Each structure stands twice: as C-alpha cells, then as structure tokens.
Amino acid sequence: TVYRVCYQSLWEDFVVAGTARLMDEYGLDGVYLDGTGCLLPCYNHYHGCGPRDGVGRAHPRYTFWATRSLMRRLWQVVSSRNPNGQINLHNSAFMTVPTIAFATSLWDGEQLSTTPGRTLPERMPLDYFRTEFMGHQWGLAAEFLEYVLPYSYRQEWGLTLLHDVPTRPYGPHDQLELASQLWNLMERFGRRQATWLPYWRNGDVVTVQPSAAYVSLYRHPRNGVLAVVYNYGARATEVTVALQRAKLGLAERVVATDALTGMALDCEGGTLHLPLDSLGWQLVWLRQEQ
C-alpha cells in the first residue's frame, strides 16, 4: 500500500525532523526519497487544500511551494551535516524543477511500465530519453531505472551509455558486477577529464551505418577515444563506424580493443566493423599504436 501525504501540513516538519534525527544518531550519508518530490492532488481543507466552488464541490490543490519547502529543508539538513551528503530522489515522470532542484541525483524510469509500444525503440524514442532522462537540463546527475522493461540489464545499459547515463543495479548480483566493470572502466579511461561527443552532435568526426546504429564518443587529451557503439534496430547487423582520426586527435595508426574484455579489434583505416545483436552494444577503446 502506498500512502500519499500533502506537505502543506505537519508532515513537512515530521519528515524534516525525522531525517535530522536519523542522520545525527546513525551518521547517515544522506537519504533516498521515493516520490517525495512529486506533486499530487490534495483535497484536505483542514490545512488549506481542496478549495470549494459555488456549489460546494472540492477541487484539488497541487502544493508546489510546500513540497519545494520540504525539499529545500531536507537539503539544508543533509548538507549541513555532510557537505558531500546525498539526496537521491526517485521521481519517475515528475520532472518538476521547483522540487527536484534540491536533490543531488535522480532515478527515473518506473513510468515506462505503462508506456505504449511493443519494442524498446517504440517505447523509448531517443528524443524522449534526451528530453527527460539525462539530467542535464535539471542540473542533476541521473540514473536509469531498469526493472520495469522486458529487457536484460545489459541491453538497457546500451541505451543509457549512449547518453552518458548509468543504469542503476537493482536485483541480481551479476548486475552489480557489470556496473562495477563499467564504473572502473570510466575511471581508468578518465571520463571526468574527457570531452563527451554525443551521437547527435559528432557527425563531423564519425559516421555510422546502418541508420538504426548510433555512436557516442569520449575524447581524452591523453588516453585516446572511448566509443559507445549501439544497435537500436530490430535485427542483428554489422555496424560500421568510420572515425576521422585527425579530428579526434588520434594518430594514423591506432589500436582498438574491446574496452571491457581487452580483445583486439580490427580498425584498418580508422574503420570498425562490429557485429551487434538487436539492442547490442560494444565499448571500443582507441589509442595510439605504441
């Protein structure tokens, strides 16, 4: 059972005070909030909601400012006790900027259980992902929620890696193993120091075929290029990626490897030919030949 509450009530003080007490008693690093930043209708006239019209019929009130006040106060509680403290907000589909602005990260995706469509591209067009799930326009780190879609954890990582977004492990132990491999890879490559070149903005340095395939790139000043190659098509296919090596700061002769397994890949002339299943992906690390 899910119990919804309105923060234009004593619940605001209750949640804030309870969070402060728990952090003080147990030294918590922060809080996970499940839907706390969502705006929901309230009809309770005892705390100022549910205004009535001329015939006595109650109407809902959406308490933006009360919910924003709660989130702001929670941020003050967490950050004053731990400057690196986390407010991890699960707010699927409710991208209400006044309330989510005080979180440190977002977890989004549960609404996809009811999104129309038979295949993943039908249920998640790429412009939909860019609009809601990247976190850039909210100024927040984003994670993707994967457990509602009928696809494997690995398959969903392809979609999110393409957008520089991690898929949170939630379930079997092998999910954490894959996630940790990817986290470690990004640390080794130097993702924080790299320039990200997403698939919709890198046509001057790379081309990819067929049309249902995409590639996003990370360009590091010393460590080469990390390519995320993804087949968003309905069938297995060979994906061809042609890199403009000079524009990417790569030497004429480069070494290409599968970034997770270390397996050598052919990159003759700066071109990769990768057989990928539908929703399959591969991370390719390209470096100067030693």
Task: List each language-model region with its residue ranges.
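Aromatic- and acidic-residue-enriched carbohydrate-binding clefts of CAZyme catalytic domains
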Residues: 1-9, 39-72
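Active-site-adjacent "subsite" loops/lids of carbohydrate-active enzymes
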Residues: 1-26
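Short acidic/polar active-site loop segments enriched in Thr and Asp
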Residues: 29
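Conserved Walker B
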Residues: 36
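Active-site-proximal substrate-binding groove within the catalytic cores of carbohydrate-active enzymes
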Residues: 63-250, 254-260
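Short, solvent-exposed loop/linker segments at beta-strand-coil boundaries, enriched for Pro/Gly
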Residues: 262-264
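C-terminal beta-strand-rich structural cap/linker in extracellular carbohydrate-active enzymes
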Residues: 267-290
